[in-house]
From Swiss-Prot:
The RuvA-RuvB-RuvC complex processes Holliday junction (HJ) DNA during genetic recombination and DNA repair, while the RuvA-RuvB complex plays an important role in the rescue of blocked DNA replication forks via replication fork reversal (RFR). RuvA specifically binds to HJ cruciform DNA, conferring on it an open structure. The RuvB hexamer acts as an ATP-dependent pump, pulling dsDNA into and through the RuvAB complex. HJ branch migration allows RuvC to scan DNA until it finds its consensus sequence, where it cleaves and resolves the cruciform DNA. CDD domains: UBA_RuvA_C. Residues 151-200 are annotated as: Domain III. Homotetramer. Forms an RuvA(8)-RuvB(12)-Holliday junction (HJ) complex. HJ DNA is sandwiched between 2 RuvA tetramers; dsDNA enters through RuvA and exits via RuvB. An RuvB hexamer assembles on each DNA strand where it exits the tetramer. Each RuvB hexamer is contacted by two RuvA subunits (via domain III) on 2 adjacent RuvB subunits; this complex drives branch migration. In the full resolvosome a probable DNA-RuvA(4)-RuvB(12)-RuvC(2) complex forms which resolves the HJ. GO terms for cellular component: cytoplasm; Holliday junction helicase complex; Holliday junction resolvase complex. This is Holliday junction branch migration complex subunit RuvA. Keywords: Cytoplasm, DNA damage, DNA recombination, DNA repair, DNA-binding. Residues 143-151 are annotated as: Flexible linker. The lineage of its organism: Bacteria, Bacillati, Actinomycetota, Actinomycetes, Micromonosporales. SMART domains: HhH1. InterPro entries: DNA_helicase_Holl-junc_RuvA_I, Hlx-hairpin-Hlx_DNA-bd_motif, NA-bd_OB-fold, RuvA, RuvA_2-like, RuvA_C, RuvA_C_sf. GO terms for biological process: DNA recombination; DNA repair. Has three domains with a flexible linker between the domains II and III and assumes an 'L' shape. Domain III is highly mobile and contacts RuvB. GO terms for molecular function: ATP binding; four-way junction DNA binding; four-way junction helicase activity.
């Protein structure tokens, strides 16, 4: 089990980062919000979960151990694999996922591509008693935004399953709401996903 990795970021993409650890480049699958905090050439630590399949070994990375624990818990629900669990964390921060499950907020859960009404109800039914304490307070998200946020959000949306045209439309709509200080990329991504959810 690889619990975490620490190394220099050598590359990033819409859904992954490469960290050089002891001369070896490790490809780590990450949610867009996690990738937004990474900088090529800078050291980073990611909490990780290794998913072993018959034909592959895939390392998933997270900003902290809390997100990793929730990723692993989500996979204990029927029909939830690592990709869908990561998609949940790409759309909502861990505290929002816990709140949605604890409060049976299926509307929030169905904003995740790949989760329909029945899937959301199943998540609530199977995980509600195991989700742990739900923090009181508003949704929060950490991240560093650069001038390249529209492309980061666009790539993240395409990676989550929307078409390039839908992603472009959502990015344009979000850009029109940005006035003054630009919010972190994860906040902008969730705003775009909410817009796309209303057009489904």
């Amino acid at each position: 089990m690889i619990a975490s990795v620490r190394g220099v970021v050598t590359a990033t993409g819409p859904d992954h980062a490469v960290l050089e650890v002891g001369g070896v480049g490790l490809a780590v699958q990450c949610a867009p919000g996690t990738i937004a905090d990474l900088r090529v050439g800078q050291p980073a630590r990611l909490a990780t979960s290794l998913v072993v399949r018959e034909d592959s070994l895939t390392l998933y990375g997270f900003a902290d151990d809390d997100a990793k624990a929730l990723f692993e818990l989500l996979q204990t629900a029927s029909g939830v694999g690592p990709r869908l669990a990561q998609a949940v964390l790409a759309v909502h921060p861990p505290e929002a996922v816990r709140a949605a499950i604890a409060n049976a907020d299926t509307a929030a859960l169905t904003r995740v591509p790949g989760i329909g009404k029945k899937g959301a109800e199943r998540l609530v039914l199977e995980l509600r008693d195991r989700i742990g304490p739900v923090p009181v307070g508003a949704d929060s998200a950490a991240g560093v935004t650069t001038g390249a946020w529209p492309e980061q959000v666009r790539q993240a949306l395409v990676g989550l399953g929307w078409t390039a045209a839908q992603a472009d439309q959502a990015v344009t709509a979000v850009a029109e709401t940005v006035d003054g200080a630009v919010p972190p990329v994860p906040v902008l991504l969730r705003q775009a996903i909410r817009l796309l959810g209303r057009t489904r």
